[in-house]
Amino acid sequence: MNRLLQRQLFLENLLVGVNSTFHQMQKHSINTCCRSLQRILDHLILLQTIHSPAFRLDRMQLRQMQTLACLWIHRRNHDLQATLDVINWISP
């Protein structure tokens, strides 16, 4: 297995773990604003990757940043400006 394939497999496994944790939390405590943030970021990721020859790995990395941003927002205050700041920060 070459190095790039190993890296991709590692990131896929990491992402599954991060998403699993996020969805377990979501069932119990993630507020509506966090779910809204998730939808906004899903849309941004789609816009950023639909017109470019993005590799699967690029999409996964964007998705991972999105999930971590949602967790970050949830742990902090549920504040619109903070949400917008995070969106600006993770958007290339």
Curated annotation (Swiss-Prot):
List the disulfide bonds in this chain: none
**Alphabetic keyword roster:** Host cytoplasm, Host mitochondrion
Q: What GO cellular component term, any one, is given?
A: host cell mitochondrion
Oligomeric form and interacting partners: Interacts with NSP2 and NSP5.
Instruction: Give the highest taxon in the source lineage.
Output: Viruses
Q: What is the lineage of its organism?
A: Viruses, Riboviria, Orthornavirae, Duplornaviricota, Resentoviricetes
Q: What's the protein called, per UniProt?
A: Non-structural protein 6
Task: List where in the cell it is found.
Answer: Host cytoplasm; Host mitochondrion
The entry's family comment says: Belongs to the rotavirus A NSP6 family.
Q: Which organism is it from?
A: Rotavirus A (strain RVA/Human/Philippines/L26/1987/G12P1B[4])
Please name the InterPro entries in this protein's record. Answer: Rotavirus_NSP6
- Main location per UniProt? host cell
